[in-house]
Swiss-Prot record:
Domain of life: Bacteria
InterPro entries given in the database record: DUF1508, YegP-like_sf
Pfam family, one: DUF1508
Organism: Mesorhizobium japonicum (strain LMG 29417 / CECT 9101 / MAFF 303099) (Mesorhizobium loti (strain MAFF 303099))
Identification of the protein by name: UPF0339 protein Msl4696
Amino acid sequence: MAHKFEIYKDKAGEYRVRFKYNSEVMFSTEGYSTKAGAQNAIDSIKKNGPNAPVEDNS
Protein backbone atom coordinates (compact mmCIF):
# COMPACT_ATOMS: atom_id res chain seq x y z
CA MET A 1 0.00 0.00 0.00
CA ALA A 2 1.64 3.22 -1.16
CA HIS A 3 -0.68 5.69 0.61
CA LYS A 4 -1.64 5.46 4.26
CA PHE A 5 -2.73 7.39 7.32
CA GLU A 6 -0.91 6.78 10.60
CA ILE A 7 -2.12 7.70 14.07
CA TYR A 8 0.70 8.18 16.54
CA LYS A 9 1.31 9.70 19.96
CA ASP A 10 3.74 12.62 20.11
CA LYS A 11 6.17 13.52 22.90
CA ALA A 12 3.51 15.68 24.57
CA GLY A 13 1.13 12.71 24.73
CA GLU A 14 -1.23 14.00 22.03
CA TYR A 15 -2.51 11.92 19.14
CA ARG A 16 -1.55 13.09 15.67
CA VAL A 17 -2.21 11.88 12.16
CA ARG A 18 0.33 11.77 9.39
CA PHE A 19 -0.32 10.90 5.77
CA LYS A 20 2.46 8.98 4.07
CA TYR A 21 3.18 8.08 0.48
CA ASN A 22 5.96 5.54 -0.12
CA SER A 23 7.30 6.14 3.41
CA GLU A 24 7.48 9.93 2.87
CA VAL A 25 5.38 12.11 5.19
CA MET A 26 3.18 14.32 3.02
CA PHE A 27 1.45 16.12 5.91
CA SER A 28 0.62 15.81 9.59
CA THR A 29 -2.17 17.22 11.72
CA GLU A 30 -2.42 19.19 14.91
CA GLY A 31 -2.49 17.24 18.17
CA TYR A 32 -5.70 15.71 19.52
CA SER A 33 -6.36 14.75 23.13
CA THR A 34 -8.02 11.47 22.14
CA LYS A 35 -7.41 8.80 19.53
CA ALA A 36 -11.05 9.23 18.50
CA GLY A 37 -10.29 12.88 17.68
CA ALA A 38 -7.44 11.79 15.42
CA GLN A 39 -9.69 9.21 13.74
CA ASN A 40 -12.32 11.92 13.20
CA ALA A 41 -9.67 14.01 11.43
CA ILE A 42 -8.92 11.10 9.09
CA ASP A 43 -12.63 10.60 8.40
CA SER A 44 -13.05 14.32 7.64
CA ILE A 45 -10.08 14.38 5.27
CA LYS A 46 -11.37 11.32 3.42
CA LYS A 47 -14.87 12.80 3.16
CA ASN A 48 -14.01 16.41 2.30
CA GLY A 49 -10.55 16.20 0.74
CA PRO A 50 -11.34 14.82 -2.72
CA ASN A 51 -13.46 17.87 -3.62
CA ALA A 52 -11.54 20.53 -1.71
CA PRO A 53 -10.39 23.50 -3.80
CA VAL A 54 -6.72 24.39 -4.09
CA GLU A 55 -5.93 27.85 -2.72
CA ASP A 56 -2.66 29.29 -4.03
CA ASN A 57 -1.31 31.80 -1.51
CA SER A 58 2.08 32.26 -3.14
